[in-house]
Amino acid sequence: YEYPQYYLVNPAAYAALGAYMFLLILVGFPINFLTLYVTIEHKKLRTPLNYILLNLAVANLFMVFGGFTTTMFTSIRGYFVLGHLGCNLEGFFATLSGEIALWSLVVLAIERWVVVCKPISNFRFGENHAIMGLAFTWTMAMACAAPPLVGWSRYIPEGMQCSCGIDYYTRAEGFNNESFVVYMFTCHFMTPLTIVFFCYGRLLCAVKEAAAAQQESETTQRAEREVTRMVVIMVIAFLICWCPYAGVAWFIFTHQGSEFGPVFMTIPAFFAKSSSIYNPMIYICLNKQFRHCMITTLCCGKKA
């Protein structure tokens, strides 16, 4: 917190991180804001499923304003100049955003499973279910991001010391880091991923069976396949962005006392931050209705 950490790596590396964060802000803010604005402006986009996708956009904006701006500033300065309070805020927003994204994918996976596999007959995913899903994602995300603020573990500068995360590195007395990390990985990483994989495993079987039996009309099957493909790609993108960070964090936690270079944790941590731009990009690329509405909005109401 007190002086530039240029003894860790070349100062040019800090400048590169600052430029990278500026790029994420430059892309992340407009694309997530546009997702929100277009959905609010076009009534036909205000479907229960899209509530969850909007939730991802809101979480990403939290990350942009609460995390990216802070990290860009500290990268330029070469150390976490904002002190302990700033570290808590940056670590909190990064963790909160990542967890909201993960639990939103859980809700989307359950929705796809219920709608396509029909384990509950005559069930329709409605507005009330979507609102309950939103409340669930925020509750679970807060249950992961808030404890370090009140003494169960803590947020500390990591890697090149210009961004903050959970303390996987030490067994500092009074913080119970070990129990929190086990709780976090079990309840807030492995459990949601297990639910997602279960839902999509059942989903793939149901889609194959329906196609073979021709139980639905071709139009309905195609629409369900498009939505399912979009959500599956979101899950894959999440795994690509966050699994390296989670894997390195767990490795550091289980090898405390060993020496690690500052870049070892910095690269996966900053790579994970790119998750704030991939969900809206996937949504825009794979959802024809949203893409049409977005073009209409950008063309000031003129149909493209």
From Swiss-Prot:
Record: glycosylation sites: 177
Entry's localization field: Membrane; Cell projection, Cilium, Photoreceptor outer segment
Main localization category: membrane
PTM annotation, UniProt: Phosphorylated on some or all of the serine and threonine residues present in the C-terminal region.
Transmembrane regions: 14-38, 51-73, 88-110, 130-150, 180-201, 230-251, 264-285
Extracellular side: 1-13, 74-87, 151-179, 252-263
Motif ('Ionic lock' involved in activated form stabilization): 111-113
GO cellular component terms attached to this protein's record: membrane; photoreceptor disc membrane; plasma membrane
The protein's role, per its UniProt record: Photoreceptor required for image-forming vision at low light intensity. While most salt water fish species use retinal as chromophore, most freshwater fish use 3-dehydroretinal, or a mixture of retinal and 3-dehydroretinal. Light-induced isomerization of 11-cis to all-trans retinal triggers a conformational change that activates signaling via G-proteins. Subsequent receptor phosphorylation mediates displacement of the bound G-protein alpha subunit by arrestin and terminates signaling.
Family named by the database record: Belongs to the G-protein coupled receptor 1 family. Opsin subfamily.
Name listed for the protein in its UniProt record: Rhodopsin
Naturally occurring in which organism (per UniProt): Ictalurus punctatus (Channel catfish)
The encoding gene: rho
